[in-house]
Design a protein with these regions (language model features):
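Alpha-helical transmembrane-segment detector that highlights a single hydrophobic TM helix
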Residues: 29-37
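Transmembrane alpha-helix/helix-exit interface in multi-pass inner-membrane proteins
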Residues: 9-29
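Residue-level detector of alpha-helical recognition elements and their boundaries
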Residues: 3, 33-34, 81, 99
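Membrane-embedded catalytic cores of phosphoryl/pyrophosphoryl-handling enzymes
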Residues: 39-165
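Interfacial segments of alpha-helical transmembrane regions
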Residues: 1-14, 76-77
Length: 166
C-alpha cells in the first residue's frame, strides 16, 4: 500500500506541479482558438493547463507497479485495459489532447518502474518476506475478473448512469 501511495504521489506531483506549470499548454476546453467548439460533459472543463495528464500518469503508474509486483498476465492485462480506458476517458471528455495522454502514460510507467525498483531494494536489503505480497494465481484471476467486470458493468450501465446524474 505504501508503494502504491508513493507511485501515485510521484506521478501526480510530477504532472501537476512540475509539467503543467512549466509547459502551460491549454487544455482543449481552454484553448482560445477552439474552446467554444469542444463539446463538454456536464459543463466540466478541467483546470487551465493539461500537459501532461495526471490521470494517465496515475493510472499507468499504478498498473505498472502492480504488474511488476504480481507478475500475473491476467491481472496485468486487466490493469492496463483499465488504465487505457481511464486515459481515453480524458480525451472523450475533451479535457486532454492525445499528446497530453501519451507523455502522461509514459511518465506513469517510468515512476511505476522506479518505485518497483525501490521496493525490490527494500525486499533484498531488509530481508522482507516476499510471499506476503505475491498473489496466488487464483486470487490474481479473481482480481482480473473483478476489474474487467467493473469495466463491462460501467459500459453496460453508462447511459442509465448518465441519465441519473443529469
Amino acid at each position: 500500500v505504501l508503494m502504491i501511495a508513493l507511485t501515485i504521489t510521484l506521478c501526480d506531483q510530477f504532472a501537476s506541479h512540475v509539467c503543467k506549470p512549466i509547459f502551460t499548454r491549454f487544455r482543449p476546453t481552454h484553448h482560445p482558438d477552439f474552446m467554444d467548439q469542444v463539446k463538454v460533459v456536464f459543463g466540466y472543463r478541467g483546470g487551465k493547463y493539461g500537459f501532461i495528464s495526471s490521470h494517465a500518469a496515475n493510472s499507468f503508474g499504478f498498473a505498472m507497479l502492480l504488474a511488476l509486483i504480481f507478475r500475473n498476465r491476467w491481472l496485468t492485462g486487466s490493469l492496463f485495459l483499465w488504465a487505457t480506458l481511464n486515459a481515453y476517458s480524458r480525451i472523450y471528455l475533451g479535457v486532454h489532447f492525445i499528446t497530453d495522454i501519451i507523455p502522461g502514460a509514459l511518465s506513469g510507467l517510468f515512476f511505476g518502474w522506479v518505485v518497483y525498483r525501490l521496493y525490490r531494494l527494500g525486499v533484498v536489503r531488509w530481508h522482507l518476506p516476499e510471499e506476503s505480497v505475491w498473489l496466488s494465481t487464483r486470487k490474481a484471476h479473481v482480481m482480473a475478473v473483478a476489474i474487467v467486470g467493473v469495466i463491462v458493468f460501467l459500459f453496460v450501465l453508462a447511459d442509465p448512469l448518465v441519465s441519473v446524474l443529469k
